[in-house]
């Protein structure tokens, strides 16, 4: 398989989507966009994938919307289904420097929240944010704690509702303060 390679490695890679699988026999792939508006995935360029233990730049040749929610794309030099299948389940990555600057103090990129320590207003550490779930109502922080003895870790879901539950976000110290209690059963 020949993927266009530029001697470049993303310094601060951010996942903006995922290659879901092959589409048809001519090298097209289905992609899942993680951007807020699904079409915004095409604003960012170049795309990188971590393929066969190396970062590679992949270039779009064509793209189109399928059934109003998913895109199919054709990459340069990916010409058949076998090549497309080899790319399946790879994350689509861009440099974080491409993201626009946030001017509202209550706006955050997920990349900045993931990894933050979660502290209660009483000073108890609940764990670290390992991922975020996007729902129509609000985002949900997935917080992993290793405090509990009978299992290796416990995940806790905390709604990201500013002022009501999320009391403070300090990206310098990597700490999110929450008004939330964990109850052991």
UniProtKB/Swiss-Prot annotation:
It is found in: Cytoplasm. GO terms for molecular function: ribosome binding. Keywords: Chaperone, Cytoplasm, Ribosome biogenesis, rRNA processing. Residues 105-184 form the PRC barrel domain. It holds the Pfam family PRC. GO terms for cellular component: cytoplasm; ribosome. The keyword rRNA processing applies. Transmembrane segments: none annotated. GO terms for biological process: ribosomal small subunit biogenesis; rRNA processing. InterPro entries: PRC-brl_dom, PRC_barrel-like_sf, RimM, RimM_N, RimM_N_sf, Transl_B-barrel_sf. Belongs to the RimM family. An accessory protein needed during the final step in the assembly of 30S ribosomal subunit, possibly for assembly of the head region. Essential for efficient processing of 16S rRNA. May be needed both before and after RbfA during the maturation of 16S rRNA. It has affinity for free ribosomal 30S subunits but not for 70S ribosomes. The PRC barrel domain binds ribosomal protein uS19. Binds ribosomal protein uS19. PANTHER family: RIBOSOME MATURATION FACTOR RIMM. This is Ribosome maturation factor RimM.
């Amino acid at each position: 398989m020949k993927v266009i390679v530029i001697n470049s490695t993303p310094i601060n890679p951010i996942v903006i989507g995922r290659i879901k699988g092959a589409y048809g026999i001519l090298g097209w792939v289905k992609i899942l966009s993680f951007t807020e508006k699904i079409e915004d995935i095409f604003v960012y360029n170049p795309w990188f994938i971590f393929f066969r233990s190396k970062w590679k730049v992949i270039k779009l040749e064509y793209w189109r919307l399928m059934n109003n929610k998913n895109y199919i794309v054709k990459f340069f030099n990916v010409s058949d289904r076998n090549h497309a299948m080899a790319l399946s389940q790879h994350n689509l990555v861009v440099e974080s420097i491409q993201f626009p600057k946030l001017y509202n103090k209550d706006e955050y990129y997920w990349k900045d929240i993931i990894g933050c320590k979660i502290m209660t207003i009483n000073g108890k550490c609940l764990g670290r944010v390992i991922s975020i779930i996007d729902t129509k109502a609000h985002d949900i922080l997935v917080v992993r704690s290793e405090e509990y003895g009978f299992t290796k870790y416990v995940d806790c879901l905390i709604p990201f509702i500013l002022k009501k539950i999320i009391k403070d976000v300090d990206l310098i110290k990597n700490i999110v303060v929450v008004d939330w209690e964990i109850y052991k059963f």
